[in-house]
């Protein structure tokens, strides 16, 4: 009898869930909603998406449904934008209406809240504007675009070259050393100090950063975001975000140490001290985003994004130099002609080095390290490429489809520096070069990244010739996706010139 009594309840629950599912699907029935694969009840298209290789999956769906297609991830409506026209229309033409970020329920476990969202994942509004303005102005005050910061980078490049010299021409993987060098530039900006390359906490921070990136692209994470009800299962979210929580704990320790040396009476030496000074001004203002919780989020954003993206691009650069020794020799010849082999490279040299500049840009295009950018969300109903996209829709901007658009690039799937040179050998930058995204949410660290890429790359090519180790097979030029696209593991030999 008890079992019989449960049957009506089960049927009622099933009907309720079906109605909820139908409510979330109703926009797909609109006349001009983008096409897409048929979603399953409850799960939507979660099983249609390969989260281990999302860029490839989206490319296959683009070929089937066109440059603007839709998905339903559980009950979350998603539209994927492909190609330069669709991406630019969304991010630039409709920039005000697509500048928001979708809520990420699982991030509440990390301390995200209305006034503690950092910069990159913050919702579009007063708190984001406040932190974006603060970050840009503080980086400028600390020397971005000036000789002072350029000197920090060139000194760190000298330390990196010394570490490469210590390898004595033996085969080694360069990734860890590149991580350390780039991280020290970020550490100088955020903590006012650099770390020795063998510092145990420094090494631990790298490990946690890379593990956290793997967590970002996990299937279970996407399920928890799509079905927030599952977050109520005790301990599940903490397990999924174990490395990200440990990363934030490590940053907290560094911030606590740094506060002990802060003198409010002195001008800020770094971003952390500038933030602490703003916190003092904002005391008693509950609406301010300058608070303890947001300090760790802002520093975490700058440290993780600023370190991993640039060091990964440099890793791609060295890989492509050993795969294309003719390009490497031509870069070195330009370095010798413009800079020589004695003095350190300077940003002022870049204007006289069109080929090296073209190579660096082609490394960014070919490496395509952030293929899907960061998700956006519509803040009102918009029309895009002839389709109607409702308010609250999550947008994926497929930057990979722009950087490797067959209609724009002569050889989209090959490493070809001439993409960025005109017939006279002058540097040119096509409109489809969007590795930093575009619009209101374009990467705020772009000027710093450009400086680091030029100075680190030219310093390394000035001092060393790179080659595939004798007896080893030619490394793969295919990347590995885990939110970022990193080169497949490889070794090289760095021989002093």
Swiss-Prot record:
Keywords: Endoplasmic reticulum, Heme, Iron, Membrane, Metal-binding, Microsome, Monooxygenase, Oxidoreductase. GO terms for biological process: arachidonate metabolic process; xenobiotic metabolic process. Its cofactor is heme. It is an enzyme of class 1 (oxidoreductase). GO terms for molecular function: heme binding; iron ion binding; oxidoreductase activity, acting on paired donors, with incorporation or reduction of molecular oxygen, reduced flavin or flavoprotein as one donor, and incorporation of one atom of oxygen. Its EC number is 1.14.14.1. The keyword Oxidoreductase applies. One of its GO terms (cellular component) is endoplasmic reticulum membrane. It is a peripheral membrane protein. It comes from the Eukaryota. InterPro entries: Cyt_P450 (IPR001128), Cyt_P450_CS (IPR017972), Cyt_P450_E_grp-I (IPR002401), Cyt_P450_E_grp-I_CYP2D-like (IPR008069), Cyt_P450_sf (IPR036396), Cytochrome_P450_fam2 (IPR050182). Belongs to the cytochrome P450 family. This is Cytochrome P450 2D17.
